[in-house]
Regions:
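Conserved SF2 helicase motif VI
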Residues: 2-3, 162-186, 203-204
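Switch/connector loops and helix/strand junctions flanking conserved nucleotide-binding motifs
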Residues: 4-10, 24, 50-52, 146-149, ...
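Conserved P-loop NTPase
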Residues: 32, 36-56, 206-213
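Conserved interdomain hinge at the start of the Helicase C-terminal
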Residues: 50-106
Length: 216
């Protein structure tokens, strides 16, 4: 679980669970062998914007530069195909169903999960993903928490966003230890558009706060 940073939330947590016995960060858990060591790759996205884009709302910017950005989506698709050349279990996290469908249609041997799926559908999709070689699972924010798939070898954050908690919770999906992997590879994108560039910088700060290895 992601421990809250604000004092009141931490006190509420302590009141329910008891006093802190030992404070261990992600780096410590990695060093002690409880989490898989990650390598984070920040992939720059070419600036295709115009002056007029500064007048767009955040929702409009997100749709243009993330959901429907053909150049960016092609980068994600080609990245997945390249990884699939070797044994792998790839998790791609997106924000909305439309983005999930775009990637699902273009990436071979991919599976898709969304919030409206009932429990039986989720379980079957996850099992199919686990049992298939060189497979890709594309999920909306449902994949951020509550899903335990330790076999994940590669995580692609295709959704952007700036929230530290959301970023670290997504990261946690891939750090589970499993006999099939010695390392896990994380891919994130440095978008150059209004709102999105600032959000990318915030995510990098979140990774750096854990002392993780980052390639920019």
């Amino acid at each position: 679980a992601t421990v809250p940073k604000d004092p009141m939330s931490r006190l509420n947590l302590i009141s329910g669970l008891g006093k802190v016995i030992k404070d261990v960060d992600a780096t410590g858990l990695i060093d002690e062998g409880f989490l898989t060591k990650p390598l984070i790759q920040i992939i720059p996205v070419k600036d295709t914007g115009t002056v007029e884009d500064t007048e767009l709302s955040y929702r409009e910017v997100y749709e243009k530069f993330i959901t429907e950005n053909e150049l960016r989506n092609e980068m994600i698709i080609e990245l997945a195909k390249k990884i699939q050349k070797k044994p792998s279990k790839i998790l791609i996290i997106v924000k909305d169903l439309k983005h999930a469908e775009i990637l699902h249609e273009a990436i071979p041997n991919s599976f898709k999960l969304e919030g409206k799926d009932d429990l039986s559908v989720r379980q079957k999709t996850i099992e199919d993903f686990k049992n298939s070689e060189h497979s890709v699972l594309i999920g909306t924010t449902i994949m951020q928490t509550g899903i335990d798939i330790p076999e994940i070898t590669h995580l692609v954050n295709a959704r952007g966003l700036k929230s530290e908690i959301a970023t670290l919770q997504a990261l946690g999906r891939a750090l589970r230890i499993h006999k099939s992997k010695a390392r896990v590879f994380i891919y994130d994108f440095f978008d150059r558009a209004p709102y999105l560039e600032k959000h990318a910088k915030e995510r990098i700060k979140s990774y750096e706060s854990l002392g993780l290895e980052i390639n920019k």
